[in-house]
From Swiss-Prot:
EC numbers on record: 2.4.1.174
Protein name stated in the entry: Chondroitin sulfate N-acetylgalactosaminyltransferase 1
Outcome after substituting N264S: In SDJLABA; reduced GalNAc-transferase activity
Gene giving rise to this polypeptide: CSGALNACT1
Cellular component GO terms held in the UniProt record: Golgi cisterna membrane; Golgi membrane
Organism: Homo sapiens (Human)
Annotated compartments: Golgi apparatus, Golgi stack membrane
Keyword Coiled coil set for record: yes
All ranges on the Cytoplasmic side of the membrane: 1-14
Reaction(s) catalysed by this chain's protein: 3-O-(beta-D-GlcA-(1->3)-beta-D-Gal-(1->3)-beta-D-Gal-(1->4)-beta-D-Xyl)-L-seryl-[protein] + UDP-N-acetyl-alpha-D-galactosamine = 3-O-(beta-D-GalNAc-(1->4)-beta-D-GlcA-(1->3)-beta-D-Gal-(1->3)-beta-D-Gal-(1->4)-beta-D-Xyl)-L-seryl-[protein] + UDP + H(+)
Ranges in the topological domain labelled Lumenal: 36-532
Disorder: Skeletal dysplasia, mild, with joint laxity and advanced bone age: An autosomal recessive disorder characterized by skeletal dysplasia, short stature, short long bones, advanced bone age, joint laxity, and facial dysmorphism.
Amino acid sequence: MMMVRRGLLAWISRVVVLLVLLCCAISVLYMLACTPKGDEEQLALPRANSPTGKEGYQAVLQEWEEQHRNYVSSLKRQIAQLKEELQERSEQLRNGQYQASDAAGLGLDRSPPEKTQADLLAFLHSQVDKAEVNAGVKLATEYAAVPFDSFTLQKVYQLETGLTRHPEEKPVRKDKRDELVEAIESALETLNSPAENSPNHRPYTASDFIEGIYRTERDKGTLYELTFKGDHKHEFKRLILFRPFGPIMKVKNEKLNMANTLINVIVPLAKRVDKFRQFMQNFREMCIEQDGRVHLTVVYFGKEEINEVKGILENTSKAANFRNFTFIQLNGEFSRGKGLDVGARFWKGSNVLLFFCDVDIYFTSEFLNTCRLNTQPGKKVFYPVLFSQYNPGIIYGHHDAVPPLEQQLVIKKETGFWRDFGFGMTCQYRSDFINIGGFDLDIKGWGGEDVHLYRKYLHSNLIVVRTPVRGLFHLWHEKRCMDELTPEQYKMCMQSKAMNEASHGQLGMLVFRHEIEAHLRKQKQKTSSKKT
């Protein structure tokens, strides 16, 4: 039994060994039959059990690595060549720009584009800050102030006329005309932009433009302040634009409501009843009937003719149902500075806009809005340049009669001049007048106190708006320079008197009148002798 069992186990062992050998043989045959061949014999991978398999793998890998390394090196060389060519082209372009700018006299920064753009924006904003848009700049003298010019759609009102230009004229130069048109169009584009639109928004056109003022500072740029009609009565739209010798920059877009802005017109007076009667006729028409937001303060010196002045006020009050006036009587010698100072301090209401005026001033209702729009408490005071009328007796000497006053108020070179040396007419809030210290009451006689106050504002941080206005006139009256004046005051008085009489050409005709008459007599004699 044991022998049989041993034989069976030996037989089974041999069968298992044979099966294992058979499986191994089949596996070897399968590997030999299914080994992949390359397209080329030298790229065929050797078998793992081959005696050269390891060396073959290393050789093929080294060859592939070398090919990859060569390809990468080639790409790097091409990229480097492209970078070098791009840098060379950029340098050529930059040098060309610098040469062009140098030829034009410009100095451009050769910094990277990002830095250059940032520096440019910073520079433009610094130009806006230096242009007295948000705050005033302290100035040494009144001659350092840069005045504004004013303009409408048709006319420009300018200070610098020379011998060929006119105080009021249509802009003849194309660059000036295009400049102002561009400013108005830029403002209209802003007003009609989607950001400004609202459910009740209406389109703005050039007909809504009222007036603008502008001034150019050669080291900064041009500042524009444009005023448009608002959506309601007594409402306005004002846009402040700045051209820093380049594109216009929008600085502010303000909505201004002047419906409740009261103006206190202060007039110092002594005698001059006829002039006061004429002034009150203008005041009634412009302030009471048209504007309706004005208070009148009359500061009267002395008692002579005081009843006549009071009678004119009372008659105007009854006829126009006007009660907004104050009459202050002072003793002593007339002093314009003292009268204005007392009138300003006498006001007991809230902060009010003051208009320092004279009895020989004519103004329109449009000027009153100009006064409101160019003042702001704690920030801005208005010193308009008025148009001063020449002596009508000289201007219209060749006419049969002098025309009515309204027909005389024409802004032309032959009829008057911009009184750019006068600082008496001014609009400023009472708080600013008090804070600046008011007038210097130690100054006696003619002139001086106005310039002193003006200089104090120039030395402060308030913005001083100085511009000619088309609705403010100084009516001619004979000027007497008293012997009691100091030499400096007397000189100023005589200069003012000479300026008030006539234009340069008209005065020349008066100076050479005798020569002209002699020439006419000779011509007449020659004509008579030829006839005989």
